[in-house]
């Protein structure tokens, strides 16, 4: 364990950031899962609304630095392509 005051502070900050990042990543997984479930059920309207929510969550996570912006763009692109293919 850290002995210096500054090292203790940095450790506490890193734990707080890790918890926040974990929550954001879990949220990303859940919104992507919502889109995929709607796609499996062939529900275009529900998939479209879930896609809007997923893209918002992914863009926000990318802007905060939780995920790389290209990763977010790739996931949004693939989900959009899948939603557009549903007849």
From Swiss-Prot:
Species per Swiss-Prot/TrEMBL record: Nitratidesulfovibrio vulgaris (strain ATCC 29579 / DSM 644 / CCUG 34227 / NCIMB 8303 / VKM B-1760 / Hildenborough) (Desulfovibrio vulgaris)
Ranges for region Disordered: 1-22
GO cellular component, one term: small ribosomal subunit
Name the record gives this protein: Small ribosomal subunit protein bS20
PANTHER family: 30S RIBOSOMAL PROTEIN S20 (PTHR33398), SMALL RIBOSOMAL SUBUNIT PROTEIN BS20C (PTHR33398:SF1)
Gene3D superfamilies in the cross-refs: Ribosomal protein S20
Coiled coil regions, renumbered to chain: none
Gene: rpsT
InterPro entries per record: Ribosomal_bS20, Ribosomal_bS20_sf
Protein family according to the UniProt entry: Belongs to the bacterial ribosomal protein bS20 family.
Entry's Gene Ontology BP terms: translation
Biological role: Binds directly to 16S ribosomal RNA.
């Amino acid at each position: 364990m850290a002995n210096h005051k500054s090292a203790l502070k940095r450790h506490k900050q890193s734990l707080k950031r890790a918890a926040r990042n974990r929550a954001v990543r879990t949220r990303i997984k859940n919104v992507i899962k919502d889109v995929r479930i709607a796609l499996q059920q062939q529900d275009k309207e529900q998939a479209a609304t879930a896609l809007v929510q997923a893209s918002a969550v992914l863009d926000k996570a990318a802007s905060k630095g939780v995920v790389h912006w290209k990763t977010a763009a790739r996931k949004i692109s693939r989900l959009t392509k899948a939603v557009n293919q549903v007849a």
